[in-house]
């Protein structure tokens, strides 16, 4: 078992706001892994972030982000508890980071609970069909399919996506860190992502004809 140092306990305490003994117990349970210990505290509701999640967050900000010369645009709404925090540089920076994440990672939902049941059922069905094609035993099809759906969530649910600036963190971790630092409940409510020309059928032209037109060789 890894030795739990006072420095590790202090680091976890500063990050989560939990008590010293709770931090030490969490680190012991997590085998000295700080990230896992933080998760242990969150699950037990002992971290500062966990204690704040039940509080009403009705203030906040709507931010926009335009990427690639106007080809991708994002609107995102992030809520906090007070207008004072909503106007701080730290909160505004967080909202901007979330908007950039949406632009870069193309999530479809904020959290897994928003994914329609029929979409989940279809993903399970596809995963099982693929496993059967690979001659996997029927007894483990459900386990394989569940694993595939978990991967689906991590790809398309914003809160479970790897952060584009540090893939060791999920967006949920980024939010948890912000809650602990800012001191208020913070929630990502919704987002919209726009891609120029998405869903439109582009006219396909012959490359040779295009070159000829550009050179003035065709009328």
UniProtKB/Swiss-Prot annotation:
Name under which the protein is recorded: Elongation factor Ts
A Pfam family: EF_TS
UniProt superkingdom: Bacteria
Gene3D superfamilies: 1.10.286.20, DNA helicase RuvA subunit, C-terminal domain (1.10.8.10), Elongation factor Ts, dimerisation domain (3.30.479.20)
Function per UniProt: Associates with the EF-Tu.GDP complex and induces the exchange of GDP to GTP. It remains bound to the aminoacyl-tRNA.EF-Tu.GTP complex up to the GTP hydrolysis stage on the ribosome.
Keyword Protein biosynthesis: yes
Stretches the record annotates as Involved in Mg(2+) ion dislocation from EF-Tu: 82-85
Recorded GO MF terms: translation elongation factor activity
Localization terms from the record: Cytoplasm
């Amino acid at each position: 078992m890894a030795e739990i140092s006072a420095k590790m306990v202090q680091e976890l305490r500063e990050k989560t706001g939990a008590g010293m003994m709770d931090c030490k117990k969490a680190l012991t349970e997590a085998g000295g892994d700080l990230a896992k210990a933080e998760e242990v505290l969150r699950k037990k509701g002992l971290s500062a972030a966990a204690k704040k999640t039940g509080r009403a967050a009705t203030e906040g900000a709507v931010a926009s982000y335009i990427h690639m010369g106007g080809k991708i645009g994002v609107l995102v709404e992030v809520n906090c508890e007070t207008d004072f925090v909503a106007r701080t540089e730290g909160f505004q920076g967080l909202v901007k980071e979330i908007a950039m994440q949406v632009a870069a990672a193309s999530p479809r939902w904020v959290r897994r609970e928003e994914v329609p049941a029929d979409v989940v059922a279809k993903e399970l069905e596809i995963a099982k069909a693929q496993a059967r094609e690979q001659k996997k035993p029927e007894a483990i099809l459900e386990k394989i399919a569940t694993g595939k759906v978990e991967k689906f969530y991590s790809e398309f649910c914003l809160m479970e996506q790897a952060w584009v600036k540090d893939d060791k963190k999920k967006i949920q971790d980024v939010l948890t860190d912000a809650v602990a630092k800012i001191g208020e409940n913070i929630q990502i409510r919704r987002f919209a992502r726009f891609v120029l020309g998405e869903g439109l059928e582009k006219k396909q032209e012959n490359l040779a004809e295009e070159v000829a037109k550009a050179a003035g060789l065709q009328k």
